[in-house]
């Protein structure tokens, strides 16, 4: 567990603070996730504008343990369409959440690779991908 995991969960209002580093992004996700306790696997996604702040709406979709092509394809296709209507410099932020404890799993790394590969295919600019379990929020990769 990292030093920042021992710190209190950041208040929710800090989720809209600028993201200027990977650690900032991790802290924004910590604020958005709140107390860590997950019953199902979800993929969370939000947009970070050119001002480097999260948009006010974060979405999530249920996912299976292993990535499925159509789900990843549809997400990236939708994000590309959305980004086409937004200011240049807007990026997508992704977080996988699910029950459990311990270090990053092979399956989580597979999810990260699938998401990254499909994002490249659709030219969706991604922030570093994170994962949250019942113990901590961690950078994937």
Locate each region found by the language model.
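Polybasic/polar functional segments that serve as interface/processing modules
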Residues: 1-141
């Amino acid at each position: 567990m990292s030093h920042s995991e021992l710190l209190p969960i950041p208040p929710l209002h800090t989720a809209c603070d600028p993201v200027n580093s990977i650690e900032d992004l991790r802290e924004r996700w910590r604020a958005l996730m709140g107390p860590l306790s997950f019953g199902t696997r979800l993929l969370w996604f939000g947009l970070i504008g050119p001002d480097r702040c999260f948009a006010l709406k974060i979405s999530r979709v249920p996912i299976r343990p292993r990535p499925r092509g159509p789900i990843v394809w549809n997400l990236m296709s939708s994000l590309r369409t959305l980004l086409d209507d937004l200011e240049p410099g807007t990026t997508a932020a992704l977080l996988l959440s699910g029950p459990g404890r311990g270090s990053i799993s092979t399956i989580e790394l597979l999810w990260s690779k699938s998401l990254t590969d499909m994002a490249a295919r659709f030219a969706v600019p991604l922030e570093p991908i994170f994962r949250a379990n019942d113990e901590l929020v961690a950078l994937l990769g």
